[in-house]
Curated annotation (Swiss-Prot):
This is Insulin-like growth factor 2 mRNA-binding protein 1. GO terms for molecular function: mRNA 3'-UTR binding; mRNA 5'-UTR binding; mRNA binding; N6-methyladenosine-containing RNA reader activity; RNA binding; translation regulator activity. It comes from Homo sapiens. Belongs to the RRM IMP/VICKZ family. Mainly expressed in the embryo, including in fetal liver, fetal lung, fetal kidney, fetal thymus (at protein level). Also expressed follicles of ovary, as well as in gonocytes of testis, spermatogonia, semen, oocytes and placenta (at protein level). Expressed in various cancers, including testis and lung cancers (at protein level), as well as kidney, prostate and trachea cancers.
Length: 577
């Protein structure tokens, strides 16, 4: 993706003219400019310089009276399903962008690209070429909060690799290497190890003191704590605060945190710029609910144990560019450092639980990408890579059996129905289209019902997407308090004959299920099976707990079905003999 196409050139433009323009704007390039009639090509050293050239020149710089148009050079064979969208308003919410993208087809992946510009850039993969073509036609130049979007193709690596399934691809061995190699059916996939960093937010005026003369101070911190420290100075130019990422063991992160906090306190005292310098920790929004705990109990305990005052930034501050919440800790240095240890312990636990759930989803739902679902924005360094990039799993192919349709009932607060439906039904339609699921809201059982049933019908991936968005919407619209985690009751139906297998002998299976998933699982006794001879299993918990419980129960049902079919097959063979 480092080769650029330069368009809208006068026919008299020479390579020397382009070399001069690139030199004037200090844009690095490699090789020579290949100039054609009205356009040219050039290679950049890496993706960083390619993006910088696009942001610097495209539609902004004139050459011989014409504005340059620069974008990634993409061969026609690779103009498939992937596009890049630039000039996105930085304050835009993920949901708004998702809704816009979903108007043109099924988004398989949406990941943010790190750039030095103030606006955001995302790479988007649609499910087929026609959807991508429509998106480019409609979105290029589309006005979004006074920003004109710029859209172009980017190379589709899968096309570059050539078709799979034993067929020879046109690119042969020159195709780009795969991110993950295919995994044999049933073979355990090796999970890529990703450590969660400690992310701090520090006042810009103290960054120089933290780095030190010629980097001496930060080198000393790195050496003493055995850590890797990144100071994100170039991001958000002019901002009052800068982010620092510390990569190390939990102990190493805590030691580095203490040293950085001590430097800031000393600098504040010497320069008399502040009476108090609080510790500010950045944590991805997905983990904050579990840090807070039910009715804020976890957070209160940390405050009491460490003698600190802790506040967390509002959900309203989250944007496309900023999926993290700011946790502010006030108190003595020692106490703040103890609080950091407790906070990051909770965050790491939440992260590990989510990784386990993601790993489970990657095996049960091939091709699932959590960035596309919108639960884990891919830009976050605190989020593991999508399972599909680790395992190399491919989406459902034509030779595979289509995923089985499932019906799930999710119970939401009655007052949240309007938010889920949206104005003139717009939100529920977009949600249904995004998840590729049927979503209906059942009438209230009584006029004063406090909950309403949402009926979702679709395959496993559709269930994951739809339920995830519903959980997210309820939190976003403040139907649950800022210190309260979203926990919903979900019903799935199982054959009455298999209910015993879900419960297990003496309740062993259901107890193991609850311990494993952290969800409450109830199979009500004395149920009368419905007309399809099915009974209800109730699941209560936060999103990942509920999803994991649903998948485990489906797994049990699949085993029961397989054993039943095997028994029937054996009986048939015995009769033939």
């Amino acid at each position: 993706m480092n080769k650029l196409y330069i368009g809208n050139l006068n026919e008299s433009v020479t390579p020397a003219d382009l070399e001069k323009v690139f030199a004037e704007h200090k844009i690095s390039y490699s090789g020579q400019f290949l100039v054609k009639s009205g356009y040219a090509f050039v290679d950049c050293p890496d993706e960083h310089w390619a993006m910088k050239a696009i942001e610097t020149f495209s539609g902004k710089v004139e050459l011989q009276g014409k504005r340059l148009e620069i974008e990634h050079s993409v061969p026609k064979k690779q103009r498939s399903r992937k596009i890049q969208i630039r000039n996105i308003p930085p304050q835009l919410r993920w949901e708004v962008l998702d809704s816009l993208l979903a108007q043109y087809g099924t988004v398989e992946n949406c990941e943010q690209v790190n750039t030095e510009s103030e606006t955001a850039v995302v790479n988007v993969t649609y499910s087929n070429r026609e959807q991508t073509r429509q998106a480019i036609m409609k979105l290029n130049g589309h006005q979004l909060e006074n920003h004109a979007l710029k859209v172009s193709y980017i190379p589709d690596e899968q096309i570059a690799q050539g078709p799979e399934n034993g067929r020879r691809g046109g690119f042969g061995s020159r195709g780009q290497p795969r991110q993950g190699s295919p995994v044999a059916a049933g073979a355990p996939a090796k999970q890529q190890q990703v450590d969660i960093p400690l992310r701090l937010l520090v006042p810009t005026q103290y960054v120089g003191a933290i780095i030190g003369k010629e980097g001496a101070t930060i080198r000393n911190i790195t050496k003493q704590t055995q850590s890797k420290i990144d100071v994100h100075r170039k991001e958000n130019a002019g901002a009052a605060e800068k982010a620092i990422s510390v990569h190390s063991t939990p102990e190493g992160c805590s030691s580095a945190c203490k040293m950085i906090l001590e430097i800031m306190h000393k600098e504040a005292k010497d320069t008399k710029t502040a009476d108090e310098v609080p510790l500010k920790i950045l944590a991805h929004n997905n983990f904050v609910g579990r840090l807070i705990g039910k009715e804020g109990r976890n957070l209160k305990k940390v405050e009491q144990d460490t003698e600190t005052k802790i506040t967390i930034s509002s959900l309203q501050d989250l944007t496309l560019y900023n999926p993290e919440r700011t946790i502010t800790v006030k108190g003595a240095i020692e106490n703040c450092c103890r609080a950091e240890q407790e906070i990051m312990k909770k965050v790491r636990e939440a992260y590990e639980n989510d990784v386990a759930a993601m790993s489970l989803q990657s095996h049960l739902i091939p091709g699932l990408n959590l960035a596309a679902v919108g639960l884990f924005p891919a830009s976050s360094s605190a989020v593991p890579p999508p399972p599909s990039s680790v395992t190399g799993a491919a989406p459902y192919s034509s030779f595979m059996q289509a995923p089985e349709q499932e019906m799930v009932q999710v119970f939401i607060p009655a007052q949240a129905v309007g938010a889920i439906i949206g104005k003139k039904g717009q939100h529920i339609k977009q949600l249904s289209r995004f998840a590729s699921a049927s979503i209906k809201i059942a009438p209230p059982e009584t006029p004063d019902s406090k909950v309403r049933m949402v009926i979702i019908t679709g395959p496993p991936e559709a269930q994951f997407k739809a339920q995830g968005r519903i959980y997210g919407k309820l939190k976003e619209e403040n139907f649950f308090g800022p210190k309260e985690e979203v926990k919903l009751e979900t019903h799935i139906r199982v054959p009455a004959s298999a209910a015993g297998r879900v419960i297990g002998k003496g309740g062993k299976t259901v107890n193991e299920l609850q311990n494993l998933t952290a969800a409450e699982v109830v199979v009500p006794r004395d149920q009368t099976p419905d007309e399809n001879d099915q009974v209800i299993v109730k699941i209560i918990g936060h999103f990942y707990a509920s999803q994991m419980a649903q998948r485990k129960i489906r797994d049990i049902l699949a085993q029961v079905k397989q054993q039943h079919q095997k028994g029937q097959s054996n009986q048939a063979q015995a009769r033939r003999k």
